[in-house]
Structures are given as structure tokens and as C-alpha cells.
A protein has these predicted regions:
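RNase H-like (RuvC/DEDD) metal-dependent nuclease/polynucleotide-processing core
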Residues: 2-188
Length: 188
């Protein structure tokens, strides 16, 4: 979710930086607005600040625990060493393989392959992740994969948090908002 030290009303420097650098790799970001994420982002930032976690932007060294923003699509480029956006979003499965005219069950199998690759990449960095990716025979609808996709997104963000704590991320943006990415994507 986009967050900033000030209310978000339009595209931020962080969004432009990510889209400029990673758009050619299929990882541009949508422009946030006052409506989306709107008050939710302000409340999230305020709630974390009340707990002692201020938003870390790229204008200063962070020496205390902080809230950071990350973008799973970009993180996956580094995690899986891919050149282009990983096709793992259930709602976009019709677009990913449009030219191939895949059936629903074929799209499910493709998504599950991507899910397994993502989990394998995460397993190299986070121990103890239980098996939660279903077998193709256990999936009857694409929408039933949404909770699995959400769990993967959460784990990807946790991995970026670990990378950030270890000093292996770079914030793209400015003093009001930064999206943190693995430094290997900037300084290979």
C-alpha cells in the first residue's frame, strides 16, 4: 500500500522512480490518489507511528525500527533473478497467457508453478514456511487462489523487511515516500 509522510493526493516521486526504472520490466506502479489509498494510508502511517514505527523514507539513516513500503513485483525480480514481471496474480491470468488461449485449468497450473517458484525462493531466505500451495487437483476456481497469492505477497514483504534490516535495500523516492527494493536490482 502506498504510504507517505504527508497525505497522498497524486503520483509521488517514489512511484515515478519505480515506474521509470522497472516499467520496462513489466513492473510500473499505479498512480495513487486522495481516494486510493486515501485515508487508509494516513491511518496506517499514524497507527504505526503511535507504536513507535515511523515511516522510513530515503532522506535519512534509519536507526530505529520503522515502517517501510515495498512492491512485491519488483522484489520478485531479485528474489527469482527474473528479467521480467513474474506472472503470479490470479486476476491477471487471462492476460498473461492470452495468446496461448489457455483453459482455466491450464492457467491454474501455470499460476501454481509460479507460486511454487516464489515459495522456493523465499524458502532460501526464511526458514519454517509451511507448505500451503495446493496441488492442481485441489483447485477448482481461479478465485480460490487469491488467499494463496495474498500469503505469498505477505511473505515477499517480510523478505524485503529482512533485507532492509540487513541493510540490503535501497529506497527509491524522496523525503516524503520511498519504495524499498533489493539493492541487487540497483547495484548488481
Amino acid at each position: 500500500m502506498p504510504v507517505a509522510t504527508t497525505p497522498i493526493t497524486s503520483r509521488r516521486a517514489a512511484d515515478t522512480a519505480i515506474s521509470s526504472r522497472f516499467g520496462p520490466r513489466g513492473c510500473a506502479v499505479h498512480s495513487p490518489s486522495a481516494e486510493r489509498p486515501g485515508a487508509i494510508a494516513d491511518q496506517l502511517r499514524a497507527d504505526f507511528a503511535a507504536l513507535g514505527y515511523s515511516l522510513h523514507t530515503n532522506d535519512r539513516e534509519q536507526t530505529t525500527p520503522a515502517l517501510i513500503e515495498c512492491y512485491p513485483h519488483v522484489a520478485l525480480l531479485a528474489l527469482l533473478k527474473r528479467d521480467y514481471r513474474v506472472p503470479y496474480k490470479m486476476s491477471r491470468s487471462g492476460q498473461y497467457w492470452k495468446a496461448e488461449k489457455l483453459t482455466r485449468s491450464e492457467r491454474i497450473k501455470r499460476l501454481l508453478e509460479q507460486f511454487r517458484a516464489i515459495k522456493a525462493g523465499l524458502d532460501l531466505h526464511i526458514s519454517g514456511i509451511p507448505e500451503f500451495i495446493p496441488k492442481p487437483s485441489e483447485v477448482t476456481t481461479l478465485t480460490s487462489l487469491k488467499p494463496v497469492e495474498d500469503m505469498l505477497d505477505g511473505l515477499i514483504c517480510a523478505w524485503i523487511g529482512i533485507e532492509h534490516i540487513e541493510g540490503r535495500t535501497i529506497g527509491l523516492g524522496n523525503h516524503t515516500a520511498a519504495i524499498w527494493v533489493p539493492e541487487t536490482l540497483i547495484n548488481p
